[in-house]
Amino acid sequence: MTAQQEVKPQATPALSQILFRRDWENPQITQYNRLEAHPPFYSWRHLDAAQNDTPSPQRQLLNGQWSFSYFTQPESVPDEWVEHDLPEAISMPVPSNWQLHGYDIPIYTNVQYPIPVDPPRVPQNNPTGCYSYNFTLEPDWILSGQTRIIFDGVNSAFYLWCNGRWVGYSQDSRLPAEFDLTPYLKAGNNRIAVLVLRWSDGSYLEDQDMWRMSGIFRDVSLLHKPDIHLRDIHISTHLSPEFSSAHLEVMAAVNIPLLDINNSQVTKAYQIQVQLWLADSLVASLRQPLGTQPIDERGHYTDRTHLSLRVEHPLLWSAEQPALYRTVVSLLDSQQKLIEAEAYDVGFRQVAIHQGLLKINGKAVLIRGVNRHEHHPQTGQAIDEESMLQDIILMKQHNFNAVRCSHYPNHPLWYRLCDRYGLYVVDEANIETHGMQPMRRLADDPQWFSAFSERVTRMVQRDRNHPCIIIWSLGNESGHGATHDALYRWIKTNDPTRPVQYEGGGANTQATDIVCPMYARVDEDQPFPAVPKWAIKKWIGLPNESRPLILCEYAHAMGNSFGGFARYWQAFRQYPRLQGGFVWDWVDQSLTRNDENGQPYWAYGGDFGDSPNDRQFCMNGLVFPDRTPHPCLYEAQCAQQFFQFSLVSTSPLIIKVTSEYLFRNSDNEHLYWRIELAGKSVLEGSFPLDLLPESTQQFSLTERLPAICGPGDLWLNVEVRQVEETPWSPSHHRCAWFQWRLPHSLAVLSRGLSDSATSNNLKLHQDIQHITVTHQQQHWQFNRQTGLLEQWCVGGENRLLTPLRDQFVRAPLDNDIGISETTRIDPNAWVERWKKAGIYQLEQRCLSLHADTLSQAIQISAEYIYEFAQEQLLHTHWLYRFDQQGHMTIDVRVQIATSLPSLARVGMCCQLSDIYENVEWLGLGPHENYPDRQLSAQHSHWSQPLDQMHTPYIFPSENGLRCNTSMLSYGNWQLTGQFHFGISRYSTQQLMAASHQHLLRSEAGTWLNIDGFHMGVGGDDSWSPSVHADNLLTNEIYQYQVCWQYKDSI
């Protein structure tokens, strides 16, 4: 142990004396007696155990049930607690957040701090958790060696006692705090006590957009090391220019007593051995004594050494092919006997920025990334391996190759799993000061320098051996100050093998190797003062800008969102220096809570009585809290797919397939193709898809099509499926797809239904109140006053619970609401524009209603105007045509005042009395899709249960639309035309009124929305209007047609 690391226990002051110092309000005090950062240690005592990653008996988990007492402030904790548990103590699981176990409340905020902003001071009422745990050590742990305790994550600051004696203090919630317990331990029972503070000055550096919770939320473990032991290991790989050979570079430092550290004869008696294994094969091995080459005029290091092992033709690590070796680093004594060994998974890979491109192993990589918070709806920020694996497998299955640890270092196991399964990682320091004014305030304050620097340097020291980490990040949304420049230089000096990114200060400062904006748009400038966000196509062409551009956050997936995502990917593929980005974000950060009836529901900001709060802004995920996919996850999967397709010729039918894989052959994929007419296959085939990386190949599907007769469009569908299962996917997993509408000339189309009839089955009846059309067992009744079709009777039973009428509104999306809330109105938000224009308060008036009898049909014409504040805003004309087959065709023409903003929709709605189990349609599906989010949807014949037509967004909104539909069948109802539709047990009005999904109640019958036109959902961000111009409804005139029939009456 070095002199700096030695712990000399002194008489322990009383708890009240320690707390009197208020270390948690001093930014220059971040720890007492905490050991230096290093990669995870396990101290194996057998080489084969280290090689095989066998659980080490030298590391013991202390997870489980701990004793817990809660206080509203630290000063209320009695001094005697450090010696023994208090009578009111309860059992608390570790790891966990105490707010999820009945103590205190979770608080959700985005930008604003949850406490008054007065750094470094925090509230006097500072919730405090007092934990204790008893354990018994192995006798040999007491006799010799060093016993450490490791806290992988404690929020936000804590003091530690062992057997009544004070050990130390630490803050930084997201990196390990490790202490030497050796001087405090005894034979038999030992008791540790941990006092955890909810708020500390460190909380000002942890203003991330997440739930603010407290406690010991990651693993706690004991580690036993020999007296002489490995204290740091740094592993890096260096590849030759042609990648045919490599060097494994290992720096190992040893803890040696101070008296011996400058005695070369003593230190050279110890040797470091490095073995490189590939499965059970020893690839390379090297052994050498401690000691380095001279460093400067004062000599060399005696307590460390540097080893370099040459490897010929190494397997290269990438997210596509995560080839891992096992490096075992051993400390040997003078007799060549093993003292201890540490071991790490190692990947040979090179990360470099060359000619403006981020390259992995010499290839420019396209980042298919997502931001991920550590979040679980039941356990909060305590994440286990099962949850981590679930996320990784889902990401891989949906064509993600990268993840940004937003916005803090993750649990150590996360990186091992990313190494193993193959994900590129941006490792981000636990720094965010978003609520500061200005954000850079603390980054320019010298008193906060050590607090900033430890969060960056300790992250690098812990995680730098992982091949999955390709980029370091200095943190998030903390402005750009002198501290950032200093820490950028420190990383570049200490780890020149990886680039550094940092978005603060405008995304293109001197503290970043990558231009990494958040929410910059493809073609639209956002000229904010001081930190403009240029259109990304423009940004890479700015003078003196030669860096790659990778969006650190984009495509804000809040609720029903993600419109325009495909535009980003068109740009990424078109401009080489636009190298992708990280979607915001992975999972809806909702917590499970029980309602007054004991039923669980997903809660968001404010549901726990937390104030301040930012409502549902915590729910921006591609997946629900339980990891069920949002529809937008499929859009991401399709846009990011590794195979691209183009149609070369239709006669013969030839397609071209391009592989975007950089390193792997597509030798586990089959391509399936199918020609469909009205959703039914008329010709299909398949063949192996064995493409080299970055290669393109043409495939001839068929020389000619068979004679095809029938109504509808002809579609060519292709999809790529994996043949064998992989570590992250089952066999037959679909990884890419596309479709084309084939020219009509390839199909012989049958004629539609004829209007001719041999008998007249239609009757028209008019009186002062109604107009009624009758056809056999059904009749339609119009109200003369309202002009609306208010009854559609079949066999004497009315099938309409509400009249069929115009529909111009939708239950507002999060993107429609923007930042508006009761106390803060954003006049630019769509919902506020609609309110101001009176769209929600339109008064309908019927101008005319009249009927005409034609030779084979009855025609009814109705005109309506919609007014607000005595101003006419909309004029609609409905032309109903009833034919001899009992069909009702409606032609709708809508005229819109030029003063109105874009409407949410132009369509019709009604409440049907029927409830059927399934919905069938010919159009885009199977999942929800919208005009600006339909790349992943395919045109075919689909069938789904009614309940699955509703997307259960936690904050209810417009949902469930299916676009470009030509046929809809719901029980006896059948509609044809060209329209979008949504069908649900919930009305638009109920969706607008409900604050949570679990509050929705199924209504009578079924609500049916038929849209001729629907505005896009947007999604570049959620706080400014982001629907692109071509997806707005800004025309003055809209027209559409729908044909209805009730089939069992014909």
UniProtKB/Swiss-Prot annotation:
Entry-linked InterPro entries: B-gal_small/dom_5, Bact_Beta-galactosidase, Beta-gal/glucu_dom_sf, Gal_mutarotase_sf_dom, Galactose-bd-like_sf, GH-type_carb-bd, Glyco_hydro_2, Glyco_hydro_2_AS
GO molecular function, one term: beta-galactosidase activity
Binding site for substrate: 110, 209, 477, 553-556, 620, 1023
Residues annotated as the enzyme's active site: 477, 553
Pfam family, one: LacZ_4
Sequence positions that bind Mg(2+) 1: 432, 434, 477
Keywords, in A-Z order: Glycosidase, Hydrolase, Magnesium, Metal-binding, Sodium
Cofactor note: Binds 2 magnesium ions per monomer.
GO terms under cellular component: beta-galactosidase complex
Catalyzed reaction equations: Hydrolysis of terminal non-reducing beta-D-galactose residues in beta-D-galactosides
Needed cofactors: Mg(2+); Na(+)
E.C. code: 3.2.1.23
Gene3D superfamilies per record: 2.70.98.10, Galactose-binding domain-like (2.60.120.260), Glycosidases (3.20.20.80), Immunoglobulins (2.60.40.10)
Binding site for Na(+): 209, 617, 620
Database matches in PROSITE patterns: GLYCOSYL_HYDROL_F2_1, GLYCOSYL_HYDROL_F2_2
The protein's assembly and partners: Homotetramer.
Similarity field: Belongs to the glycosyl hydrolase 2 family.
Protein name stated in the entry: Beta-galactosidase
Organism: Yersinia enterocolitica serotype O:8 / biotype 1B (strain NCTC 13174 / 8081)
